[in-house]
């Protein structure tokens, strides 16, 4: 199949546009008494008494004993802080990446407070499953995050979540195989060792196309009418590169944990992932583990920068909850500076709080450096317009067709 035709078929599959839904804004004026939102001392004993059961959803790792039961401990600390509130917490498991799909199916039956990846935001808004925040909560968010992070949880000037980390992927590599100059070029790395990349994962494959000037919903990722532009000569050239990449004896498609297991046993020398794999890799590789922003790749003699999708993970509030003042305060508490510090200590979740990022210990962390350099230098803000939902499956299937040798 011709590469231009193949790229056009992928584009056609991703171009069905969906419509914007209405946003829930019932908490736009909701004030919160969380200590993180106010610089002055708060008298929690002045709060009206509340007895309530609050449902909180988050990833399994944040509730696991091996990671210190971060979520439970932070909720218990919140309960102790609010002396007039008698709160019982019920926990459920839902990863940030699954929040949109899961919660939008039954908003009224879902958690009061939950964690979500910002690419899920428009889905949650369309389903009436996430509340617009306001008041001192938004003041705190804007005072403690970069503009890019704030933008990642903002739609039509409305803020919908309390960010707690940047969300992107970068490169892990074996320092015993690659030097600092080697890791600048993907093609150089392929000459010297085995490289694993999740080409059948739609969150990753776009990095090559964006690197060659292809766009998703315009330059800012917000123009639905512009659609996805992966067709034409630019898209065809990238597709040809990827077909050749799959044919390289040193390339391994990363699926079902192949990259992590290979890095740990030494059969793979570089992979692309995020902070969620850091602990396992660090324990297995020790000082040989290197972390870096994305490399370039050579397309027809030109070095092009790979660019990942980037965004944030945040704490959201369900507008259907019975006790919005509790839910908003808890969301802010789970995303405040102290909670981000404990998250970092427990699971190496890189903070986005600007005060924490200024601390010397965190600034020296190789993981933090790589994640922030990738976010700032080798990524684009992942579009979260409704039509982006039509990208994921066609992109995944297109990657599979390349890996399976259906394009040649």
Regions found by a protein language model. Name each.
Residues 119, 124-129, 146-183, 198-223, ...:
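Periplasmic solute-binding protein
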Residues 103-104, 109-112, 139-173, 194-198, ...:
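A structural signal for short loop-to-beta-strand junctions that line the ligand-binding cleft
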Residues 36-44, 116-170, 181, 290-294, ...:
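Hinge/lid segment of periplasmic solute-binding proteins
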Residues 309, 347-351, 368-408:
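C-terminal capping/gating helix-and-loop segments adjacent to ligand/active sites or protein-protein/ligand interfaces
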Residues 5-8, 21-120:
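Conserved N-terminal structural module of periplasmic/extracytoplasmic solute-binding proteins
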Residues 81-144, 160-161, 269-270, 280, ...:
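Extracytoplasmic "Venus flytrap"/periplasmic binding protein-like
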Residues 224-255:
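Glycine-centered hinge/linker elements that transmit conformational signals in sensory
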Residues 283-346:
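Extracytoplasmic/periplasmic substrate-recognition and gating elements
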